[in-house]
């Protein structure tokens, strides 16, 4: 299944706020009205919707998300927590959380168009896994810096998660540590996502 490129508001009206996909928010109470019209949701649908929230927020294909779930399942610790950490440490998401891009698709475009360096080296793979100690910077080109500056000017002044530090004047961000689950930028029940995939196998 390919990456979603359709109407974004349609998705947030059904699934709730997806800040990685769009800065728009569903109207207050719209979720409740949708639920009341559709009646009681089945457990399968609840798990499916949590999975879809994760997929659309991070801008993943179905195959990509399944691969991350399998990697998380083989790691030590809670599969759900490891899954979120893997997704949060993607380069496109790090740029988004730093405020260098207004959405994750926007961050992915910056990476694909070769505007971004990690530790001084050009990286054009949005799924590149960042690690503690990594410096994420913009190329020293006028166009690259203008794009980042535009995003930072338009980004809401939200509190930066503790695992990141932004040096805005230098167009640079630092990954301090692996993210703690309480700083995940999405309201999600990751256990339902893991359950969804465990029941598919």
UniProtKB/Swiss-Prot annotation:
Residues 15-43 are annotated as: Disordered. The keyword Signal does not apply. PANTHER family: 30S 40S RIBOSOMAL PROTEIN, SMALL RIBOSOMAL SUBUNIT PROTEIN US4M. Part of the 30S ribosomal subunit. Contacts protein S5. The interaction surface between S4 and S5 is involved in control of translational fidelity. Its main location: plastid. Belongs to the universal ribosomal protein uS4 family. It is found in: Plastid, Chloroplast. One of the primary rRNA binding proteins, it binds directly to 16S rRNA where it nucleates assembly of the body of the 30S subunit. The lineage of its organism: Eukaryota, Viridiplantae, Streptophyta, Embryophyta, Tracheophyta. The gene is rps4. GO terms for molecular function: rRNA binding; structural constituent of ribosome. Keywords: Chloroplast, Plastid, Ribonucleoprotein, Ribosomal protein, RNA-binding, rRNA-binding. GO terms for biological process: ribosomal small subunit biogenesis; translation. This is Small ribosomal subunit protein uS4c. The keyword Nucleotide-binding does not apply. One of its GO terms (cellular component) is small ribosomal subunit. Residues 89-150 form the S4 RNA-binding domain.
């Amino acid at each position: 299944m390919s990456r979603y490129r359709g109407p974004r508001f349609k998705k947030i009206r059904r699934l709730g706020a997806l800040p990685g996909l769009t800065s728009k928010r569903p109207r207050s109470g719209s979720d409740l009205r949708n639920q009341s019209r559709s009646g009681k949701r089945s457990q399968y649908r609840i798990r499916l919707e949590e999975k879809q929230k994760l997929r659309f927020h991070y801008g993943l294909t179905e195959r990509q998300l399944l691969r991350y779930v399998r990697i998380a399942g083989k790691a030590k610790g809670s599969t759900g927590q490891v899954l979120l950490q893997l997704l949060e440490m993607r380069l496109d998401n790090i740029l988004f959380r730093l405020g260098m891009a207004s959405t994750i698709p926007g961050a992915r475009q910056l990476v694909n168009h070769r505007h971004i360096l990690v530790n001084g080296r050009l990286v054009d793979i949005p799924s590149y896994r960042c690690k503690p100690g990594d410096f994420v910077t913009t190329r020293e080109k006028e166009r690259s810096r203008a794009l980042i500056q535009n995003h930072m000017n338009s980004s809401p002044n939200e509190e930066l998660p503790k695992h990141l530090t932004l040096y805005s004047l230098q167009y640079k961000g630092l990954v301090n540590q692996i993210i703690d689950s309480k700083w995940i930028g999405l309201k999600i029940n990751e256990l339902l996502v893991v359950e969804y995939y465990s029941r598919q196998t």
